[in-house]
Amino acid sequence: MRSPSHSVLPASAARTLLVLALTAGVSTAVPAAQATAPEAPVATAAPAAPVAATPYMGWSSWSMQSSKYPGLNPDGDYSWLTEQKVLQQADAMAAKLKKYGYSYVNIDAGWWRDNTWKPEFDANGRQTADPVRFPRGMKPVADHIHAKGLKAGIYLPVGLEKEGYGDGKVPVWNAPGCTTADIVYGDLRTTNGWDSSYKIDFSRPCAQKYIDSQARLIADWGYDFLKIDGVGPGSFKSGDNHDNVADIAAWQKAIAATGRPIHLELSWSLDIGHIADWKKYSNGWRIDTDVECYCDTLVSWENSVDDRFADAAAWSRHGGPGGWNDLDSLDVGNGEMDGLTKAERQTYMTLWAIAKSPLFTGDDLTRLDAYGTSLLTNREVIAIDQSSTPPARPVTATGDRQVWAAKNADGSFTVALFNLGDAPAAVTADWAALGFSGRGSVRDLWNHKDLGSLKDKVTATLPAHGSRLFTVTPHGPAQATTGYEAEAAGNTLGGSASVADCGVCSGSRKVGDLYLGGSLRFNDVVVPKAGVYTVKVAYVSGDPRPAEVSVNGDAATTYTFPSTGDWGTAETVSIPLSLKAGANTITFDSGSGYAPDIDRIDVPKRA
């Protein structure tokens, strides 16, 4: 994430500072000395719906906790969070948003800490409610939320917090003979995104019992959602000490043992290389850093709403029932406090919906403006997020003008147009990029309007950072194309370029090593007449990479190819190329950088 141009810390730095107080003086912190009486466990009826069958919808406290918007945190940074304010948000959600599918009321960091960030732990090293923020404890809060027909969420950092360790003699609940010294490594190595916890050693039998005790407490309080934060690999950390896969596996096991369906969400900037673990053990994973700007508004376009466009594509294959790609909080409902233009607010929600991200807002639900309400309650857009359609991804090479799409179960397409530039621009979705030709009927989802049957494409002039969202239903045939393999003997390789095996590529081969002047030229690309052709490029790239593309030796245009997620996955994007009648050459050149590996191109048989 970029740092803002003004003197406000980026989210990662702000969260780091937030935890400095958390780690200060921990060598003398003894939970038994500061413990409050544990809240009596009382069984609460569990919700019956499957966990994470669709992306969850709701609200989270962190955006308002972290903002410096005037009057929002009058008693110091992160002071917004109190029982009264959470219950006000729950009441507002029940009144305004519940009927549209919003159901989770999630309490984020700080519920066990006072305004100076001093923590509260029970006699067994488990976080418990700060008596000023939550004077009745955490169970009555969940009870109130449930009484509104909603679900309650809570938050913990990964690992054993240093203050919870105490002197190492703190007993683990319901585990005779186990103390906090028996669940961590002997050298007290640290873990999580802030190194604020001791790493738990799950080769020790007492370790699972401690996680079991935490899960039991949360379940007995009646919570339906748990966010575990600072998880690695991710959270800007790597290496053995910050590998928390075993922690998440332990949490999944502990939650299952409670018998209560609890949604387990992971944060932040998770390593995509461990996606199999995140899918196996959790119901959602944050793909990026905090969306909040830690500034005088809740968010800003540059810090880091716009960054999601570069990052979401890599994860698009991974979201589905049971576990979803989390783009973070959706702060589009409060107008000035959000820090965005109306166009940016619509674009923000458009991306979240097509990416099948959870739709949870961090706005003040008691102060939603009319425009924000219209965004958050647009049933057609919500339906895209909640449908069985897979997450969308770019179907054009990326830049300021982007087209994202996903094919729906009924054969139609969800299509989003984005203008990420700073000036108005026309953006076009060609039917060829979707794989069909002729006509398609177009439905404008934001405006609830049918645009009729359009030939070959849909174009919209968008404001800066603007968007449109459509359902496109094909009425023409599949696009007829001629395929050209990158590894074909008639092509010309230059510089470092070489042919390599590729199990996910057509023909099981590709051209790679396109770096520092490496190039691939397709020879004898034949079309019947001159025109602009929407050429589909199949490629592999573990990160976003540019390529300089030229036709017949003319000046090159640089296109950026979105990440395919790893070097074992192939995807396609389309690029417009002006071809002459007859034979053409199409060259992919890495220039002075590194280009994606190329599998093949498919050229329409007509322009």
Segments predicted by a language model, with ranges:
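Secretory targeting and sorting signals
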Residues: 2-40
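N-terminal module-boundary/linker segments of secreted carbohydrate-active enzymes
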Residues: 40-83, 266
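Aromatic-lined carbohydrate-binding/catalytic grooves of carbohydrate-active enzymes
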Residues: 64-73, 89-144, 148-238
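Aromatic-lined carbohydrate-recognition surfaces of secreted/lumenal glycan-active proteins
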Residues: 150-165, 252-273
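Glycan-recognition surfaces
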Residues: 182-189, 201-203, 257-364
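Glycan-recognition and catalytic regions of carbohydrate-active enzymes
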Residues: 326, 356-421, 450, 499-508, ...
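Carbohydrate-binding surface patches
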Residues: 346, 352-355, 360-362, 397-436, ...
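Extracytoplasmic
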Residues: 425, 434-442, 452, 456-607
